[in-house]
């Protein structure tokens, strides 16, 4: 009887293995609960590329598979640009201005199509000189607190942007606060991470008990030509609803007062690799010690798709696809560490899980500027 049971169990395992192989061939992946779901791809309806700027789309960042997409075969199809191993790359030029269909396809090892997504690649002219002078107010978190973003925007606009805000980043004014989430901007949250300290952040109106754009503009006298809204990293969760709805609430409040004010909503970026996530610390205390790269990528992917769906009918709102156009595999600063405590062999490990190096902020600026040009 024991031998029969063993043979039966081996046969069952073989059938399960065959079933899993079929599911893999169809692009079906197993989640943590042991259930099966289809591969999800996301490309916005349009990708803007300003003349003189290079924009790249990264395979693992447009898919719910994350880095697991490396187990599949992928292809970009377009009349322009470069179909590369891990990305699609396109440099805008005056000669290439126009619209181009761009298709991304995933295949299994048998050559069967698993999933596909498409967008329109729009190569647009650089802003004319008279349009490079405009005022911009950035509402954000620590990802908007790096001078490299503003320096790159200044380079692209010949130093003509007027930055507005009650706080400063280098020589640029902003409303960026380290550690802040959209939820903080909806409440009477204080800000004490850096000088000057604030008892209550300036968008909060005590009378309405929430974020109030009209109150803010009347109090500060700032009336920008455009708003950049770059939030999402703080507050990321498996369920994007709460974080996403808080961002949506800010958009809706601004447009209730200024319905034609352009808002550039920047999708937050993917984190560093697992070494960066696992080793990021403050004086030896792990900051992301319990987090896993695949799970964090899922949170970013689903927040991006939630916002796109929820705000798809919002006028004068322009999504900036930094999440899929930022090279999260290479943009984080690294340091050399031994591969183990007793080895002379060294390896590169990211020094931060969330905040990229200068190249990352410049890539985000290129993406924002291209959308503005569009």
Residue ranges and their predicted role:
Residues 21, 25-130:
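Beta-strand-enriched, solvent-exposed domains that form extended recognition/catalytic surfaces
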Residues 261, 272-325, 354, 358-365:
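Substrate-gating cap/lid alpha-helix
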Residues 132-135, 158-162, 222-228, 257-264, ...:
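Loop/turn elements at helix/coil->beta-strand transitions in domains of secreted/extracellular proteins
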Residues 1-22, 26:
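Gram-positive cell-envelope targeting signals
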Residues 174-211, 276-294, 320, 326-351:
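Surface-exposed intrinsically disordered loops and tails
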Residues 339-374:
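Histidine-centered active-site loop/cap adjacent to the catalytic His
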